[in-house]
Amino acid sequence: MGQLLSFINGNDHTEQIFIDFEHAQPSDDERELHKTVNEVLIRGPAIIDKLLAYAGCNEFIRRAITNPGPETEDAAWEAVLPSVDQLQEFYDFSLELETCFPKLLVALCKNDPKASLSNQQALAKQLADIFDFVLKFDDAKMVNPAIQNDFSYYRRTLNRMKLTKKDANIKIRDELANRMSLFFAYPTPMMKVLSETTVKFLSQDTTVPRDNVTTALATMANVCHDMVEKKKFTQDDLNMFCLRAMVGSIILFDHIHPQGAFVKKSPVNIKPCIVTLKDSNTQSSPGLLNALRFTTIHLNDVDTPGAIKQLLLLD
């Protein structure tokens, strides 16, 4: 998957960076961090599979609400408990991402970020892997209302069950339930975790300049766009990987750059990125476009060109 990637930035200066997303192996300097991050990422596909298979407890909850009584309410509670345990697994995974993501930012952004992306390709691949996971998760979560419905029912029923013999079965109590509720209430919870984690990281770690992080994200977005636009790959899954990494980079850039990703002089080639995403016309494209529309924070700023707003907001 390694290709020579070229893009022209806002200053019309051509950059050429080799990134081998398919075959990149960690160097000795990368190995320890790569192993740490990989121990988290390797579980990502199973998390996505469980989320896609999440059917929810709608029928049990409906019966308990429309025909309340010990039998229907106990049945709903017993159905919801294992589902909520699964939701906790999703939430706990977000905490692991919250821990490992700043470590990647330090490695890739402490020094020249473009050189770091080129010279630490295994870590650059992991950055793209995180964006790929986050956009997959959020896209699947957004179209599954059973997740929030199940957890809302759990919280409503929690206090009553704490007063009964069912108390012994309760693993997720008030404080954790409150944190999980905030997590699942957000339309794109995993991306929210990344953006909040990055903002917090930049406010606390003075060794990594903010400009280095935004440069790394703009570079990642532009080269991923270039890979798709120049038809480097025929496999749909590789193109979608690049598009998710591109969109994730743009969203995070928009959250931490003072002017955001959409201004005329943005280092992100935002118009070509949007055009390529719309032209991709895949099953996942609408979800990625919605992520750009609703998860970014600067799209509706007065400095955003009208043509960009129209391009993104109109189908």
From Swiss-Prot:
Subcellular location: Membrane
Topology term for the membrane: Lipid-anchor
Source species of the chain: Dictyostelium discoideum (Social amoeba)
Source organism superkingdom: Eukaryota
Protein name: CYFIP-related Rac1 interactor homolog
Its biological purpose: May negatively regulate RAC1 signaling and RAC1-driven cytoskeletal remodeling.
InterPro entries cross-referenced by the UniProt entry: CYRI, CYRIA/CYRIB_Rac1-bd
One CC-aspect GO term: membrane
